[in-house]
Amino acid sequence: QSTWGETEEEHQRTRKIAAMRLTFVVALLLVMLTACQAATFYYDFVVAESSYTRLCNTKNMLVVNGQFPGPTITVHKGETFFVNVHNQGSYGITIHWHGVKQPRNPWSDGPENITQCPIQPGTNFTYQVILSNEEGTLWWHAHNDWTRASVHGAIVILPPNNTYHRLTRPTSYQTIILGSWFNADPRTIALQNHAAGTDPDANDANLINGQPGDKYDCSSDSIYTMTVQFGKRYLLRVINAGVNDEQWFGVANHSLTVIGQDGAYVKPFSTNYVMITPGQTMDLLITANQTPGYYYMATSVFSDFNLAPFNNISATAILLYNGTVSRPTSIPFPSLPNATDDAAAASFTSLIKSLDSYGHPFDIPQTVNQEMVITISTNFLNCTSPACINPFAFAASTNNVSFLAQPISILQAYYNNVSGVYTEDFPSNPPESFDYTGDVSALTPYTAQGTRVKTLNYNDRVQIVFQGTNILSAGNHPMHIHGFSFYLVGKGAGNYNSATDPQNFNLANPPLINTFGVPKNGWIALRFVANNPGVWFIHCHIDKHALWGMQTVLIVKNGNTALTSIRAPPTGMPQCSA
């Protein structure tokens, strides 16, 4: 019916105009929605030396944009960002986006001589970082030698439209980066010890947000301080960027609620401490509900290796209630497990389960068609160079293969069908079966080098069991897989039993993670679907073990369509020497 005063012809004209306006508004909203969904961001990273002083020691070290730790990248779930890395240092460098799966985009994954060759001094390269279902805290770091000791920073991935899960909404968040300080240049330490075949000394200090804290000399005036308001809830985004050490972390007199790990939600649980390995991230809620004052947050090293040196002086920071004026003579300190407490580590990790909620569904392979058992060991190699201190060199291996990097990237060789760079014969099982966690004194600790990779077909349902061994020096090894998050379906002490242990696998709510510690003289089992074509690195995130050869490579072949195949390489890829 027409509006009062309108003719029928005028009424029809008004309806047409209204319909056109509505169509325009809907189209505009769709464009805006598409733009929001496809949001893209650009960053510039300038890698250059800056002068820093810690422990009364001043040195020049590589950092990004003059910051240590480096800048935080803040984005939303599903977005893409580009980072143009300008290398103003004196040697080649690469950057890895730890925990970002990079669907079909191994070109921007970053590990040196695996997916790219280094960005040479005076040049630049732009990484395209493609997010998918990651949400929470991840991080970026250099991925060559030990350069990541000073070249690292956080990636904060906010939920779409900042719609936090009702259990996890904080007042605000704070990034807490655990790190390592070396008085000497860490890259030089790594290369000199590697050439000499020796085990490097421990770091000179542990760090929280770039500061050792007041348990170290010359450090009390620069301790990191986080100010809170009574009654408010805060999200601590904790990252272990340490080079070689797993860490305990806690806050005095405050309970921590774990809500996320490695860019995925977990079923919330409360604890007085966390155990976090190099490479891992954890999202922790803390409520400021104690008597206003000063409270230590602190780390200490978890190191159950028989022979490895470590620095067990705690890094400290201060949790300070707003309005507190004077610093007391005594500040509460968190109670943390001792350095070799395997039981405490196992107790903590057993509490981590996935949170099944809207927008975060499970996709756990209930059956598998590719099974691998990979032993991880520390070993020896013959050392014959003039730099050798002993006739043997420290080494490490997976399935008794100590990985040998090549001067050309494996991705470049694979994509361009270059022969002679690697072989596709990495063993799916240990070449020799033995009592892996028992008395191995009759076995040789020596291993052999090789560039041997494992190939998978697109959409293979994969199960990998990492089996620790007692060869040379048993210990907890944090294994990281690039290109995937995996479900940790099982773990245990001793030798994995393929007949009985799968009966106890958690196929209901296992944690979805990208890095996890294989327990000392124990094993872990993980599952994932190989639906990300490319070349993907697997390695221990204790950097000296990775440098020694505790690493290998997965090649996931293309699917049958363009959308299930590796993307074309970007322009400007750093050139390799072969």
Q: Predicted regions span which residues?
A:
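Ligand-binding face of N-terminal immunoglobulin V-set domains in extracellular IgSF glycoproteins
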Residues: G279
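Histidine- and aromatic-enriched segments that form or immediately flank copper-ligand environments
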Residues: F41-L167, D245-V274, Y295-N311, S385-K520, ...
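Low-complexity, Pro/Ser/Thr- and charge-rich linker/hinge segments at domain boundaries
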Residues: P160-Q174, T324-P337, N560-P569
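A conserved active-site cap/scaffold subdomain adjacent to cofactor or substrate pockets
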Residues: I239, D283-Y296
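Acidic-aromatic/histidine active-site loop/patch
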Residues: T171-R233, R237-G242, I352, Q370, ...
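Cleavable N-terminal signal peptides of Sec/SRP-targeted secreted and luminal proteins
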Residues: R21-A38
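C-terminal helix/juxtamembrane-tail motif
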Residues: Q1, P103-N105, A205, A562-A578
